[in-house]
Amino acid sequence: MLRLILVNKAGIGFLCLLSSVSSGQDYGFHQPSDFGSSKLRFPSSQSYYGADFSGFFGGHGGRRPAHQFPSFSGSGYFGGPGFGICDSPIAPCTQGKYRTYDGSCNNLGNPRLGVANSPYGRLLPPKYSDGLQAPPVSVTGHNLTSARQISAILFPDAKAPDPKWTLALMQYGQIITHDMSLAAGTTQGKAHTTMCCTPDLRAALPEDTRNPACFPIDIPDHDPVFSEAGIRCMEFVRTTNDISQGCNSGNKAAEQISAVTHYLDSSNVYGSSQQGADARREFQGGRLSVELKHGRQFPPPNNNKSAVCDHLSEEEACYLTGDIRANQNPQLTVFQILQLREHNRLAGELARINPHWDDERLYQEARKIAIAEHQAVTYYEWLPIILGRENTDRNGLTYNTQDFTYDYKENVDPSVLNDHATAAFRFFHTNIAGFLRLFDEHRSSYEALRLSDHFNRPQIIEEGNNFDDLARGMHTQPQESSDKFFTTEITWFLFRNGRSLGQDLRAIDIQRARDHGLASYNHYREYCGLPKAHSFEDFADLIDPESVQKLSYLYHHPDDVEFTVGGSLEAIVPGTLVGPTFLCIITEQFYRTRVGDRFFFENGVKDTSFTLEQVNEIRRGSISRLICDNADDVKSMQPRGFEQISQDNPVVPCSLIPAPSLEPWREIRQGEHTASQPQAVDHEFTFPFFFKK
């Protein structure tokens, strides 16, 4: 049995907090009913916080339990509907070698699977209070506690840098998220045209006069932060669902819609439609459109700045990319630009070795390679850190091979799971740092940017050497530890746009899960093979007693505890960065994302596959190589960029970071000689850095 030990970042004034909440005044606490007690009993120190997680690391003989990765059945919750809005028509499928932009025709037997503007999948049935789309209530019939109140009590701030991983690990997680999911109808940090609160935020608009999509977050009278500013209401608009779009007659539960493709296909770079992709192309040399500034490539300006940026003047940068969220924070924008530059670098190199290729061929081949590189970094660098290498190997997410994997399964639904996108994959919000440090070429930090000063304001990255110094910075600065603590930059000041206070991302996460009707934490425990909690004390197998005590005051019943809340409080499984239920759901999602994608770079599917030589070159890429090749003037990197610099991971010249060769893409036309061709680099370093044990 593995014993899990969680070391808190800092102590909390829990006795003081309880004295406040027990009166039911300071935070507007309800008095818990049948299951609430201030005298909860916890296991002894010998058994507390210990659990056997062998099932997550091959406890079933190295095979996934049948219930854990169900095949697509075309109906029910295991698989999801997988259709475009109101079954809009799609073009006939052909077995071409390139992906469509909207995700259609990836699965030739069910061409709508994973398309943009289709519903999320689900593992567990929704728990809408009316069975259709009304947000959940307690199993006792009471309203659930305010999402802001839960955030303030359970998820305070306490700074504790991660001892091993860099801030780039968290930031690349946001790139993956934006690639695979975008809740339709949300504005991602910009003011929504639908207003749910009074202009002064002192109250919610009356229900009989406000838009039905409104679901504002109530702020208690004695909130420790917002009440002092007179703020009693936080704006929140529900995600577009199939009922609101007229695709569901209202006789079955609503399913929320994702506006982007469900595949890991760099839609954040290229867009999720033909029109969107064309708007981002130069149509020369296979390149994406850029604006050159002092010889540096940046995305073209967004002509609708007010919709996506909080700029102070029209001269400030605001970029057009494949994703509306690209300007959200400086380090996210840096990664978006690195991906754009990588595409253009690939297109230029392909044009050099294949001068006879036209613009379309160069663009599509560069796009195909860039997507494959993104998949390789995600699966072979990023996921083994998050989920544990043993787990990714045993569950078919990673392979230590120089062959094809031949693991495409057309009966697996690749749709992004609501359970994943709306809860489990928001785990890394705890890893966000409130200040972004800039590092020069010598890895000396000379300045830190306050995160909330730069939400939706990317201008800072164009100034001086900030682009490189932010790129180095996130590969040098530790991320915050994986635990129950969240920086106030996102729980007090999110999207504040110059105001003294902003919004609360943790409260928004909780409210979004309610909006989507996610099942309870207890149900996900059962689904993942953990025992159901019949009392609050039963949660103490995975959650510390202090947090369990708070849960008993915040919720009326153990079945009320929400997945995004309970999962965020769990002890971290050794060798991973998440607790067991999040581990279960994220593993399931990325299994589906891989084996349900006919174009996944390793699977060897006829007509869509790379050659084996090309695949092995792609495997040589890394996040550090992305920086070396595409930053302005970064000359050195540590080989494992998601890992902090150490004696085992020293900073080395970029020339020593393995680089894929594009020689396997050289197309030899009839009559050409090959004797003078450069030789492809050897494969001595085919998994050099990601598989250290």
What is each residue range found by the language model?
Residues 1-24:
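Cleavable N-terminal signal peptides of Sec/SRP-targeted secreted and luminal proteins
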